[in-house]
A protein has these predicted regions:
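Catalytic, metal-anchored helix/loop core of enzyme active sites in primary metabolism
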Residues: 1-82
């Protein structure tokens, strides 16, 4: 409950973007999400500002994890046809 869904969503968005950008292997997506869920405090949400704050904290935590743990995994970013 609380801010956990916002944290989960933000971590997932960062992880998928990193995967599509060839910075994160697909099988490491859960690791990044788990780290973010453990690293960002879950708080009760009483306003939309609380949701935005949880999202921002989660994205920052996930980006820090990426900076320390990600490596170039693919030769080039994944291209998804339109």
């Amino acid at each position: 409950g609380g801010s956990a869904p916002a944290v989960l969503n933000a971590a997932n968005e960062v992880a998928v973007a990193a995967f599509l950008g060839a910075r994160l292997a697909f099988d490491r997506i859960p690791e990044l999400i788990e780290h973010t869920l453990e690293g960002v405090a879950v708080i009760p949400l009483s306003s939309i500002e609380d949701v935005f704050a949880a999202d921002e904290a989660a994205r920052e935590c996930a980006q820090l994890w990426l900076a320390r743990n990600a490596e170039g995994v693919l030769q080039e970013p994944l291209r998804i046809p339109a």
